[in-house]
Amino acid sequence: MKIKFKIWIETDDGKPILGKGGVKLLENIRSTGSIAEAAKNVNVSYKFAWEYIKKIEGLLGGIETKKGGKGAGGTMLSEKLDKVIEIYQSAEKEIEEVLKKYEEKLNDVTTNT
């Protein structure tokens, strides 16, 4: 048996900001420098990715876009946004480690009955 979980970062009034899918998109933007390429890599539309980027920029800041087309434009994440992603990933990893311990306990109980 497994214990599963999902985590996300939300505003104080409960609006989701960043979860697993958002982190994947932002990591792809960081590595490619392209919203279009990142959207393709994570199987979302360019429109969805662009709207998500605008939302993140409005709530957290830290995204710099340069217009210019092929070879001249690009998108970069700030150090602040890199830190937010790092905090999210650290929390996710710690929770996974804790849940593994509880899975072992659960499996001990369920297989020894």
Model feature map: region roles:
Residues M1-G14:
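Short, Lys/Arg-enriched N-terminal segment that forms or immediately precedes the first helix
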Residues L25-L26:
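Short alpha-helical "packing" element that flanks the helix-turn-helix/winged-helix DNA-binding module
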Residues V84-T113:
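Helix-turn-helix/homeodomain-like alpha-helical modules used for DNA recognition
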Residues P16-K20:
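Short helix-coil-helix linker/hinge
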Residues N43-V44:
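Central "turn" residue of the DNA-binding helix-turn-helix
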Residues G58-M76:
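A short LG(V/I)-centered, amphipathic sequence patch enriched
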Residues T32-A39:
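Short helix-boundary/capping micro-motifs
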